[in-house]
Amino acid sequence: MTVNPAHTALWPAPHASGAVDATVHVPGSKSVTNRALVLAALASEPGWLRRPLRSRDTLLMAAALREMGVGIEETVSSSSSVGGGSDGSGEAWRVIPAALHGPATVDVGNAGTVMRFLPPVAALADGPIRFDGDPRSYERPLNGVIDALRALGARIDDDGRGALPLTVHGGGALDGGPVAIDASSSSQFVSALLLSGPRFNQGVEVRHTGSTLPSMPHIRMTVDMLRAVGAQVDTPESGGEANVWRVTPGALLGRDLTVEPDLSNAQPFLAAALVTGGKVVIPDWPERTTQPGDKLREIFTEMGGSCELTEQGLEFTGSGAVHGIDVDLSEVGELTPGIAAVAALADSPSTLRGVAHLRLHETDRLAALTKEINELGGDVTETADGLSIRPRRLHGGIFHTYDDHRMATAGAIIGLAVDGVQIENVATTAKTLPDFPDLWTGMLGN
């Protein structure tokens, strides 16, 4: 194995010798953890996050909030750390709100939630907050948040880029009020404004003016979490105007929140059951959730598996056959890499639609999936808004990740069925799924 430099290290993706049969404890949800951190930081009293995800993205969020003055105390309870606590089961973070202030520098890494959720928070701080990050973060659009905050009264220096690096000159408060944005490139633009909205003097009314809004489950997650801490939110689903969300100004409560497992990160393990004709159990799968990953139950069942919610968790079983699928993934775009990997191993073609916005994610995921699967012998074509996948006999080779955690897990799925696949920079999975290689080999009994 090449170990130097680290980012070009090759990880031999384990090949499954038979059907998997495993219980996999998936760590907490990144999306829930980072929203909860923001809401707790803006609350009027301390709160707790239990079983938070400890990964690069969430540690960046915690570090950024600390930079602005928020207290975050991390504790681990050995009595509740099941199986060593690698799933975060014994961990709890106490968040102690404080007056937000600069000067401060925030490293966003390549975390969309950090780069988009925190500029509105910084506008409430007293003093300048500078945002910087990985080179790829400079290419990811922030204009939706920047333009909206300026319209609401914030002062931001970005040299006209509409992207990082930038500085928010916080004035200690923000007027807020109505604002129109085009969030068609990322639903995080809407969530970012809603999360801080209760602290704006007039609250906020966000009107989406663009084409189809992607990843709606993530906006529903934001709304649910706001309501859980006492915010009043009017939404299109609750009888409000289409594409308009209103948050009333008011104090947020400090809560004691237990973070759900990250269902999107359960995807490779469920895919392993599907691809090998085996069985995987994911404990603590919620009966009701706004996480996009819950859609996997329906999608992977259509592709040949079956699932049941039991007292043990979600029990997913493969049939030994993998079928192609024609599916609109606009609401669950983050699942695309894993679905594409399974589709490349199917017995019939697949069409994945509604995910043009993936070109703006951690990498251009559509171009990356096309290139990497085809270099293993596949037949994938980019369409205007997705991928067309015709299964072919695949062979081994290097699967590049482009510093994208979901590309790495997609390559691992293919490696189950194709001998000789090597994943470049599997360590990028630490962005949202720490210890992925150990969880993966543990599932296989290696």
UniProtKB/Swiss-Prot annotation:
Q: In which pathway does it act?
A: Metabolic intermediate biosynthesis; chorismate biosynthesis; chorismate from D-erythrose 4-phosphate and phosphoenolpyruvate: step 6/7
User: Would you say which domain of life the source belongs to?
Assistant: Bacteria
Which residues take part in binding phosphoenolpyruvate?
K30, G112, R140, Q188, R365, R406, K431
Q: Which UniProt keywords apply?
A: Amino-acid biosynthesis, Aromatic amino acid biosynthesis, Cytoplasm, Transferase
Asked whether the keyword Methyltransferase is assigned, the reply is no
Where do the TM regions start and end?
none
Q: Which residues form the active site?
A: E334 (proton acceptor)
Purpose of the protein? Catalyzes the transfer of the enolpyruvyl moiety of phosphoenolpyruvate (PEP) to the 5-hydroxyl of shikimate-3-phosphate (S3P) to produce enolpyruvyl shikimate-3-phosphate and inorganic phosphate.
* Protein name, entry field: 3-phosphoshikimate 1-carboxyvinyltransferase
Species in which this protein is naturally found = Streptomyces avermitilis (strain ATCC 31267 / DSM 46492 / JCM 5070 / NBRC 14893 / NCIMB 12804 / NRRL 8165 / MA-4680)
